[in-house]
Regions:
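Cofactor-cradling patches in redox/metallo enzymes
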Residues: 124-125, 137-194
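A general structural motif
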Residues: 108, 113-114, 133-140, 165-166
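Long amphipathic alpha-helical segments
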Residues: 1-95
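Conserved hydrophobic helix-helix packing surfaces used for dimerization/oligomerization
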Residues: 100-102
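Short helix-loop-beta junction
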Residues: 117-131
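Peripheral docking tails and interdomain loops at the edges
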Residues: 189-220
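Glycine-enriched alpha-helix->loop->beta-strand junction motifs that scaffold or abut catalytic
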Residues: 129, 150-152, 200-203
Length: 220
C-alpha cells in the first residue's frame, strides 16, 4: 500500500472509531468522485482492511462485539451509497459477465454478510446477472433457488470455518442439477484450513475482484 493509501485507510478508520456514519459515507464517495479510487480499490484497500483489523477476543465479546456490529453497519451504508458509481464504472471493465447468471449465498448458521455483499457488487461491476440471497440460508432453500433460477455459477460464502463441514454435501447437491452450475467458495474460512476449494468439491475459490475477473466460460 502506498503512503497515500495508508493515510486514506487511517482516515477512514478514524471515522469508524468515532461512529461517524455520515462522515464515512462522504469520505468514501469523495474518493470515487475525485477518481482517487475505483470501486474494487475502495472495497479491498479501505473497507475490507478497516473491518479486518477488528479483533474481538472471546473473553471480551460482551464488551466489544457491539462495536464490530456498529462499524460493520457503517461500512454497509458506505457500500449502499456507492451503487451509482458502481453502475457508472461497469463499462470500464467490458461487461465480461453479460448473459451469465450467478447466485450468491451463505449457508445456514453463516451470519457474516459484508464479504458476500462485496462479491455481489464485483459481479455486478463485471456485468453478471446477479441473484443475491444473502446469509444464513437453509440448505433446502438454497437448492430450491438453484433449481428455480438455474444460475450458471453459484458462489457460496463462508467466514466461520465451522460452517465448512456442511459444504461438501451442499456442493454435491447443487451440482446434481442438470445442467450443473459451476460452484465457487468465497469467504475467509478456507484460508484457515490448509485446504483448497477442490477438497470440498468446488470448482475454485474467489478471494478478490481479480479472481472474479479471471472466471472463464462466460456466455457471449
Amino acid at each position: 500500500m502506498t503512503e497515500k493509501g495508508k493515510h486514506q485507510l487511517d482516515a477512514f478508520i478514524a471515522l469508524l472509531e468515532s461512529n461517524d456514519r455520515e462522515g464515512a459515507v462522504a469520505f468514501a464517495l469523495g474518493l470515487l468522485e475525485r477518481g482517487d479510487m475505483t470501486i474494487p480499490e475502495l472495497y479491498e484497500e479501505i473497507l475490507a482492511p478497516s473491518l479486518n483489523r477488528i479483533k474481538v477476543p472471546r473473553e471480551t465479546e460482551d464488551e466489544l462485539i457491539w462495536r464490530e456490529h456498529l462499524q460493520s453497519a457503517i461500512v454497509q451504508a458506505v457500500m449502499g451509497a456507492c451503487w451509482p458509481f458502481l453502475l457508472l464504472q461497469r463499462q470500464k471493465y467490458g461487461m465480461p459477465g453479460r448473459n451469465t447468471r450467478v447466485l450468491l449465498v451463505a449457508p445456514e448458521e453463516e451470519y457474516h454478510e459484508i464479504g458476500i455483499r462485496m462479491g455481489m457488487d464485483f459481479f455486478v461491476l463485471l456485468g453478471y446477472q446477479v441473484d443475491y440471497i444473502g446469509c444464513n440460508t437453509p440448505r433446502d432453500t438454497m437448492l430450491n433457488a438453484v433449481k428455480t433460477l438455474k444460475p450458471d455459477l453459484v458462489c457460496i460464502s463462508v467466514t466461520n470455518y465451522l460452517n465448512l463441514a456442511q459444504l461438501p454435501a451442499i456442493i454435491a447437491a447443487v451440482k446434481a442439477n442438470k445442467p450443473a452450475p459451476r460452484v465457487f467458495i468465497a469467504g475467509s474460512a478456507l484460508a484457515r484450513t490448509g485446504k483448497n476449494a477442490l477438497d470440498f468439491g468446488a470448482d475454485g475459490a474467489l478471494t478478490s475482484f481479480e479472481s472474479i475477473r479471471e472466471i472463464r466460460e462466460v456466455k457471449q
